[in-house]
Amino acid sequence: MKQSLPDVSVCLIYLAGMAVWGFVAGRILPYSWQDETKYPFRSLPFEKNGRIYEKIGIRKWQNKLPDMSKVFKGLMPAKKLEGDLAQKLPVMIKETCVAEVTHIFLGLAGVICPFLWKGLGVWCLTFAYVLGNLPFILVQRYNRPRQMQLLKSITQKRKTCVRKSYKREGKEREDTDFEL
């Protein structure tokens, strides 16, 4: 008699495989495919540039979530913003898009399980898997508008400083000549 794994075990193996696949796909997705100013990454009106998530206490719990940049230090940019923020923020903003796409994919991959395998355990595992990816999506939706605003502020301050510097030196310069 042939013995097979219980459906919940097969589902668990499938979900682990999808997590690995999602991680690898997230690392190879080109940043150019992800425009933080357009749908689906642009902050929606009801999100109020991420402030809506403060109602669920996101500031208190977001740093308690596992951080893959600490696990795979060479593969992912660190989340700490040190040094030249104007240079690092665009990368961080793109990384929020990558993370959001990855966790949405993982959530959708989890929804498929009950259609492939049967049992209450499969439903429980699916529910936990989908629900477990939701906080990561919310953190990206919360942080991205804040990072974009910070980058805009830094860029504006640098432009102002350069303009003032050139005015003191008695030089005129076109806005298009500014290097940030």
Would you name each region that the model predicts?
Residues 28-33, 37, 118-122, 143, ...:
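Membrane-interfacial segments
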Residues 17, 21-25, 29, 109, ...:
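Alpha-helical membrane-inserting segments
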Residues 31-92, 153-179:
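Membrane-proximal soluble regions of multi-pass membrane proteins
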Residues 13, 17, 67, 73, ...:
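Hydrophobic alpha-helical transmembrane segments of multi-pass integral membrane proteins
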Residues 1-24, 85-91, 138, 142-151, ...:
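Cytosolic-side membrane-entry/anchor segment at the start of a transmembrane helix
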Residues 14-15, 113, 122-133:
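Hydrophobic core segments of alpha-helical transmembrane domains in multi-pass membrane proteins
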Residues 89-121:
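Transmembrane alpha-helical segments and their cytosolic interface motifs
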